[in-house]
């Protein structure tokens, strides 16, 4: 039976009911009357998975018969969220399944809410990877993700006394019905050990990696369903286990811990995402994780290639590997090692294959985010890879000096090895040198990569550098997250936008239609009322759905400037209670996002948000017109509730710091207006929607760079010379937001007035003025609705389908099959 026939057979309420009941009985071994909501979810998910299996096998067969070139996307993060609703939607079974469960006395929405988010990522990096996989499958392209099957993910965030607390995220505690275990395709991964020279008759150097220990990578596949079921690709996730035998003799002597020591050490590799690198053990574990991902993926890629090929002559014509940020940069050394050590290729041939196969996406302009590892750690953990990296660097150094003779300073800047008291391996440089393509993720970002981050490399290889502006999948972020708006759009312009987002342009002719505006506003209000219930359940704070929902949800980081948002809140609060000037319009300030466990300043900013909220929300003088809420444990499923309800999208990073951002695209797609700096993709959003339909403020990236270079920025002058700035900072320092912990936020005052690394005070006056404009225009419902509809109509450029097509044509050279 083909997948189409299988879906047709299932495309009936009774058929799906029977499948769910069968899995309740034969998979869960339960009577229907004993089923919990979680049980119903599991039975339903397995029934849906049955429908996917034929599609997975048929898709794989189609790709293999065509001997199509395939993309392998390596990423430490894949933030896929929940899968049941998404899979039903893409299969066209959502309404049928809803009715099937309703007839069984169960609400599908309640069932979907029991599914845990897959804890396989943290922020935009992982969500972008998930959007790309969705687009690849929808476009029918052979593209597969490779990642780590984290047992706990990053962490579950709880808020205690205003502070972030990290708890384990047991997302797989009850198993995942979407993971198809593949123990027969497990692979052996060598690690540690030492290098020996093996003599040979050819008098060449033949290094042998010996005395290594072993990790075993066990894969599980998560199906990725393309819209309409045209193709079902997969995300392959690896768990780490040890090959060490359980030592029964030690166990019998009573030392259980020692008996399982090796197993536990290996399994740590796939326990958590991003273990803290503030201590040596954490750094070693991170390096092991990155190597584990790369080595497992490489073995599987080679296994797939060898199904149709016996030599490596066509490897770059059949295989494209994309490194998503620097975490998989070891792919360069690992592919070289495999080609040279395991397949006896000469260096030059192996290098030609490697560079023709690999592409690298850079996601940052923060130098500290371009990973570096101590060479001493490399030598202990991956001695053969360090040898190969030294050889790559030696040959690269000769190339640099041939082009720029005697320019030792340039060579120092470009070298993979950072010399100093403690040698470091620069992973970003390794990725650039080993790839044929290096791309940024927004026009400004790509420009700054070549002019500011790695200008020497751009001068050497200008043809390698290109831009691929990020995108998001409209199927999850509009069709699934905002079904009422999706139906309104369908009635106006049809449903072709689901697979070609440019069709939303047709909404422009509806932007001033009174009836359309009324329905658009009604849908936004329903979404706000739903979010208000979520906020109350999560925080205990009741908010007014008629207020402006002013939203900033993203990873907590100083450059993203949640602090600037808080300074505006403090300004409005102090102005109201001290001067009696109330805000023009009621606002609910919504925050969400996680801070890295070791990032003290970011965690203190979370505390500040909650402390300000505690004061504002309990002050009867203002709490009818101001509320501040921090929703804990931000994740994809929560974003799907927040984004459709937002009126105002805060995209306020310091110009020149945000690579792209994708939240900005999701909010605009759902009819929120953006207040933001000219940074990342905000610039391109402004170009698309028109400057009259976005609220831009603040310094430009080039202005900030000039001030840095000339050291002309004096935040104290803003404090002393601007009464509004002074009033806000004095309130911050006065302990009125930390009465129980005096002096708690003094460091923020000192930081802002002292050096203000992220230019908060320079941008604050412009930000406050722009927020006043927002308040005035929100009070003009017709104008606001017009702008919001225009935003939705003009986001066609920001579909991940467009992004993936550009990668496919310009970098990967893959096609739909």
What are these regions (language model features)?
Residues 1-817:
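A conserved ligand/cofactor-binding region detector
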């Amino acid at each position: 039976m083909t997948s189409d026939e299988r879906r047709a057979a299932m495309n009936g309420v009774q058929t799906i009911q029977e499948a769910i009941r069968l899995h309740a009985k034969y998979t869960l071994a339960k009577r229907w009357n004993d089923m919990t909501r979680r049980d119903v979810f599991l039975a339903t998910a397995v029934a849906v998975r049955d429908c996917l299996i034929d599609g997975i096998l048929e898709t794989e067969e189609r790709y293999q018969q065509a001997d199509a070139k395939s993309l392998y996307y390596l990423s430490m993060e894949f933030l896929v969220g929940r899968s049941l609703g998404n899979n039903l939607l893409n299969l066209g079974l959502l309404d049928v399944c809803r009715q099937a469960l309703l007839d069984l006395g169960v609400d599908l929405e309640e069932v979907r809410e029991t599914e845990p988010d897959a804890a396989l990522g943290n922020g935009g990096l992982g969500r972008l990877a998930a959007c790309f996989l969705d687009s690849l499958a929808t476009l029918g392209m052979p593209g597969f993700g490779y990642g780590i099957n984290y047992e706990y993910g990053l962490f579950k965030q709880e808020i205690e006394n205003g502070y972030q607390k990290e708890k384990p995220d047991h997302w797989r505690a009850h198993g995942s019905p979407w993971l198809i275990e593949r123990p027969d395709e497990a692979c052996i991964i060598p690690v540690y050990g030492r290098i020996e020279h093996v003599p040979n008759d050819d008098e060449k150097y033949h290094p042998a990696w010996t005395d290594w220990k072993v990790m075993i990578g066990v894969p599980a596949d998560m199906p990725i369903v393309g819209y309409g079921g045209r193709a079902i690709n997969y995300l392959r996730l690896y768990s780490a286990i040890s090959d060490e035998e359980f030592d029964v003799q030690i166990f019998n002597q009573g030392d259980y811990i020692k008996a399982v020591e090796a197993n536990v050490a290996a399994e740590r590799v796939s326990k958590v995402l991003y273990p803290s690198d503030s201590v040596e053990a954490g750094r070693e574990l991170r390096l092991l994780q990155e190597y584990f991902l790369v080595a497992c993926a490489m073995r599987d890629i080679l296994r797939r290639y060898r199904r149709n090929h016996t030599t490596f002559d066509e490897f770059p014509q059949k295989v494209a590997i994309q490194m998503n940020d620097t975490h998989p940069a070891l792919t360069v050394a690992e592919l070289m090692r495999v080609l040279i050590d395991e397949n006896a290729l000469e260096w030059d041939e192996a290098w030609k294959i490697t560079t023709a196969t690999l592409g690298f996406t850079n996601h940052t302009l923060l130098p500290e985010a371009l990973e570096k590892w101590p060479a001493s750690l490399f030598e202990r953990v991956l001695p053969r890879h360090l040898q190969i990296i030294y050889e790559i660097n030696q040959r690269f150094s000769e190339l640099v000096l041939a082009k720029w003779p005697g320019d030792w300073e340039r060579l120092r800047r470009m070298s993979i090895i950072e010399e100093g008291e403690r040698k470091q391996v620069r992973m970003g440089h390794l990725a650039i040198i080993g790839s044929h393509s290096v791309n940024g993720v927004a026009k400004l970002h790509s420009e700054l990569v070549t002019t500011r981050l790695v200008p020497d490399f751009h001068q050497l290889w200008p043809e390698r550098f290109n831009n691929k502006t990020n995108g998001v999948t409209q199927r999850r972020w509009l069709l699934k997250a905002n079904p009422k708006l999706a139906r309104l759009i369908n009635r106006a312009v049809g449903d072709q936008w689901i697979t070609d987002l440019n069709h939303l342009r047709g909404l422009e002719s509806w932007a001033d239609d009174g009836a359309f505006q009324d329905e658009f506003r009604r849908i936004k209000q329903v979404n706000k009322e739903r979010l208000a219930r979520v906020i109350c359940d999560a925080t205990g704070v009741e908010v007014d759905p008629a207020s402006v929902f002013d939203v900033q949800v993203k990873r907590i980081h100083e450059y993203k400037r949640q602090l600037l948002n808080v300074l505006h809140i403090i300004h409005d609060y102090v102005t109201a209670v001290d001067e009696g000037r109330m805000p023009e319009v009621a606002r609910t300030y919504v925050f969400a996002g996680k801070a890295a466990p070791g990032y003290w300043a970011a965690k203190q900013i979370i505390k500040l948000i909650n402390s300000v909220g505690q004061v504002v929300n309990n002050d009867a003088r203002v709490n009818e017109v101001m509320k501040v809420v921090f929703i804990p444990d931000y994740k994809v499923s929560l974003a799907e509730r927040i984004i459709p309800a937002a009126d105002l999208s805060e995209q306020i990073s310091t110009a020149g710091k945000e690579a792209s951002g994708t939240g900005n695209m999701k909010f605009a797609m759902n009819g929120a207006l953006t207040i933001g700096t000219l940074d990342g993709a905000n610039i391109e959003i402004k170009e698309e929607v028109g400057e009259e339909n976005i609220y831009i403020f603040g310094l430009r990236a080039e202005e900030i760079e000039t001030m840095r270079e000339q050291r002309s920025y004096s935040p104290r002058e803003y404090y002393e010379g601007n009464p509004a700035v002074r009033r806000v900072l004095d309130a911050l320092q006065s302990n009125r937001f930390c009465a129980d912990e005096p002096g708690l936020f003094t460091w923020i005052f000192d930081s802002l007035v002292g050096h203000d690394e992220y230019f908060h005070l320079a941008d604050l006056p412009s930000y406050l003025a722009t927020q006043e404009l927002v308040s005035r225009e929100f009070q003009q419902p017709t104008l606001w609705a017009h702008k919001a509809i225009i935003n939705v109509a003009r986001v066609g450029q920001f579909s991940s389908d467009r992004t993936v097509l550009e990668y496919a044509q310009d970098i990967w050279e893959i096609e739909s099959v």
